[in-house]
Amino acid sequence: INDYLTFIVLLFGLFCVSGNITLSGDLAGSPRINVGLLALGTLLSSWIGTTGASMLMIRPIIKMNAWRKRRRHIVIFFIFMVSNMGGCLTPIGDPPLLMGFMRGVPFFWSLKLLPILIFNMIILLFIFYHFDMKAYRKDIAAGLKPDISKPGTEVKIRGSHNLIFIIMIVIAVILSG
């Protein structure tokens, strides 16, 4: 039961902390922006957990693409990349790696998977970009436009003080091994 309790406490802590961080801005959901956010979310998954990264990144992605009619593929690729594949680099990102860490596997052992993760990210982001560009062009041709008053690149982070708690959780997990 100790293993499961550790897992639940970590998951709950990252869920609560990352759920109180909000990213917002006036970015429109274009293929380039979506690729950037998927890449960022995938890399974040190993450091704040797949649940934490999913909580943090899904709201801005949904909001930025709300104006689009063709957007199902965005959530599908989000689940593949951020909610699953991205957690492979540290025990914080993936429950089986956490169990291994609790049984003596070094914390940074799985970092050797970084080249494989990057390779898979490039392939999936390339495929995603082509799906998204095709859907984006159809939406624009249908007369749909982003729902922002003044396009720009301003991104706001609310609840940034919670980043300190995320760092504390990560350090606590590393020190517990």
PLM feature segments, named:
Residues D3, F7, S30-L38, V75, ...:
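Residue-level signature of transmembrane alpha-helical entry/exit and packing/kink sites
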Residues I1, F12-S30, L43-L56:
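Transmembrane alpha-helix boundary signature
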Residues A53-I58, H73, F77-I92, I116-G143:
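Transmembrane-helix bundle segments that line or gate the permeation/cavity pathway
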